[in-house]
Amino acid sequence: MSFFPKISFQHEVEEYLTKMFRNNELITTSGIQEMESKYQSLLSHLSHPPGFTTVRVNIHLASVKHVKKLLFEEIQKQFKGLCVPVLEHPKLQDTLLIPVIGPRRDLKKHASEVIVGAHCGYAVLRGAHVYVPGILSTSRFMKAGDLVSVYSDIEGKCKRGAKEFEGVKVFLGNGISELSRSEIFSSSGPLNGMGIRMIEPVYLSPSFDNVLPNHLFLQNLPSVVVSHILNPQPGERILDMCAAPGGKTTHLATLMHDQGEVIAMDKTANKVKKIKQNAELLQLNCIKTFCYDGTKALAVEKREDEQEGPPFLPESFDRILLDAPCSGMGQRPNMAYSATLKEVTSYQPLQRKLFTVAVKLLKQGGILVYSTCTITLSENEEQVAWALKTFPCLQLQPQEPHIGGEGMRGAGLSLDQLKLLQRFDPSAATLQGMDINSLQDSREDDLISLANKDCIGFFIAKFIKSNSK
């Protein structure tokens, strides 16, 4: 049952998605009623957080069992003795899952209100406290120590510093103010610390602020799956083409036992800095970062210098991950998607430029994994159909592990080809929520199965380069 309204789109984007979910291939096989029901279910799921928090253990520094024990103790402390299990994923040996409790519908709302920006609100729904930069408005006389109710401005209409807000807002839970209104909106400049400590969130997830920072990395479940599918081996040379903020980069290095070379590129300097910070935090030494545009990463001719960075010569890498820039429609939670249709459709040509470079940089016999965190055909299955037609040297490969669904019909791919693709579709799970009683009555196998479905929307394709055609 929905707690929040369905995700909203601009009208032209809504029409685009509706047409996509009513394509002839889908309607012929499933019927228009089934596809309409599935589409509406997806819209509801996207506005709610995933049912589990996924944590990747840095097995370079600690064992899963050890971190699981420490994490269980930390959660008990945060939840004041409430017993929420920490589950080991049977097919992802470095991954822990924590069920999310919620939505909690019976929370009392307080007179003192705090309005936060949409992105801050989404972080709160996944376990974060409220930090000052995310606060847009507070009640006029709010003091440090006040009990407050926190709301998200999902349409981006609230002006910073407002004393009240009458626009569309969504209740996120209750907290205690760490600062007064005057301190938050001080003219001496914005603060960066915690503004509201959440004590009764609508969705109860652990906060990971400074919790085992060397041993844990928060990732969405499909993002962990991607690195396992690429399956890098010690001593290999790997390219992560669009690497920020470094979750997959550091995972690849960990899977290689920090032996070999992982080249991580991003074209934004601040994002490259974040990759470096994460590599240092997790104590990984085989990662080399470069601020560079992936579409220009192929060297036209051999260079005189011995520089190890981009551009690179053809066939320089054993394996390549292209986690491509995308429209991001699979991210959860998201209650109001603001991009225009022009912005949504701009990603396909960019992805093809990056993909073309990736194919040329990949050695014969090498593996290329392409992934996105979106739900559109144009950025996923259509890209696979284009790639197979454009590059005869590429063949689709089975994925291990394969815990998501198959590819979506509508791009002209065969059933055998669709089975080789992995599409994580949040609507595959029932939007039911979880309370502590139902959690304690659940079998671990059932919880794992639910976690495999109740995650973000995501797509993965795996290719092998067979020859130099």
Ranges and model annotations:
Residues 234, 258, 283-286, 316, ...:
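Short loop/turn motifs at secondary-structure junctions
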Residues 70, 78, 84-85, 89, ...:
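C-terminal catalytic and target-recognition region of SAM-dependent MTase-like enzymes
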Residues 265-315:
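S-adenosyl-L-methionine
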Residues 259-263:
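Short beta-strand element of Class I
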Residues 2-246, 250-255, 269, 273, ...:
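Glycine-rich nucleotide cofactor-binding entry segment
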Residues 2-9, 50-52, 331-349:
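A mobile, often basic/glycine-rich helix-loop segment
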Residues 267-274, 337-363:
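Glycine-rich S-adenosyl-L-methionine
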Residues 151, 239-241, 265, 290, ...:
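The conserved SAM/SAH-binding core of class I Rossmann-like methyltransferase domains
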